[in-house]
Amino acid sequence: MFYMEFILSLIGSLLLIICVLVSVAFLTLLERKVLGYIQIRKGPNKVGLMGIPQPFCDAIKLFTKEQTYPLLSNYLSYYISPIFSLFLSLFVWMCMPFFVKLYSFNLGGLFFLCCTSLGVYTVMIAGWSSNSNYALLGGLRAVAQTISYEVSLALILLSFVFLIGSYNMMYFFYYQIYIWFLIILFPMALVWLTISLAETNRTPFDFAEGESELVSGFNVEYSSGGFALIFMAEYASILFMSMLFCVIFLGCDVFNLLFYVKLTFISFVFIWARGTLPRFRYDKLMYLAWKCFLSFSLNYLLFFIGFKILLFSFL
């Protein structure tokens, strides 16, 4: 019986990973199409019908190119960091709330925080092991940025833990049957979305990949497979952050088709931000993290703690 359950959960995990990777492929196509229409041009439209097979052609091109590595780089860490980056981006999907018994995490929120904290190391090691000044600067920027915004991210998640009384993601579904958290906590949703942009190194917070300053940033020395893996990890984390936003703020009804429409819309917002917003200034980025978001999330945390104490004192 145990073996049967184990095999079923293994098949479920494999299906989840395959679906995430296919979603990543089509998210890149969506991004290129949307950016094309924002810049008043058509996106990829030559390959197949309306350019739909384009991501698969890109994948074939990237993985069949010659794999080069810099002579002065640290060979092992240079190769392992993109693989570990993609592994973490796929591993964090385990805390997606399932109704069926695939994984039922009582500490899903904590698991998510652990995985995002580990994601810092991959960028740092990728930047350092390339042995290039540009890559190192990009890596250091990414580390400073991610650590700064992770504090506010953890505090906001902790506020929700106090509110719903559990780290389990399924509790978000029970508490949002009648009203979404987005409606009653709109400022918090905006801050969470901004932090998600910073955590995934997206515009306007793409300092790790500042082309105008750092010649592509921490992944400047990566070609073919290594670059593709970093790219896939970034887009998998964008999809995950979109999914998490839907779970926390937009009603966590995973079996409803509308949940995936909402997820697609939030992913579209990430792309929309890239097409419309210019890059932020680095000092303003740090001021935003430590002076605005930290005080905001701390105030909300104290408010929720006070609210629960008040509630229990009257019960």
Swiss-Prot record:
Q: How does it sit in the membrane?
A: Multi-pass membrane protein
Assigned EC number = 7.1.1.2
According to its UniProt record, which reaction does this protein catalyse?
Answer: a ubiquinone + NADH + 5 H(+)(in) = a ubiquinol + NAD(+) + 4 H(+)(out)
One GO molecular function term of this record is: NADH dehydrogenase (ubiquinone) activity
TM segments? Answer: 6-26, 80-100, 107-127, 153-173, 177-197, 229-249, 253-273, 292-312
UniProt similarity note: Belongs to the complex I subunit 1 family.
Q: What class of enzyme is it?
A: translocase
Gene Ontology biological process: aerobic respiration
The protein's UniProt keywords, in alphabetical order, are: Electron transport, Membrane, Mitochondrion, Mitochondrion inner membrane, NAD, Respiratory chain, Translocase, Transmembrane, Transmembrane helix, Transport, Ubiquinone
Q: Which GO terms describe its cellular component?
A: mitochondrial inner membrane
Function as written in the Swiss-Prot or TrEMBL entry = Core subunit of the mitochondrial membrane respiratory chain NADH dehydrogenase (Complex I) that is believed to belong to the minimal assembly required for catalysis. Complex I functions in the transfer of electrons from NADH to the respiratory chain. The immediate electron acceptor for the enzyme is believed to be ubiquinone.
Protein name, UniProt field: NADH-ubiquinone oxidoreductase chain 1
Q: Keyword Repeat, does the record have it?
A: no
Where does this polypeptide localize?
Mitochondrion inner membrane
Show the InterPro entries listed in the entry.
Answer: NADH_UbQ_OxRdtase_su1/FPO (IPR001694), NADH_UbQ_OxRdtase_su1_CS (IPR018086)
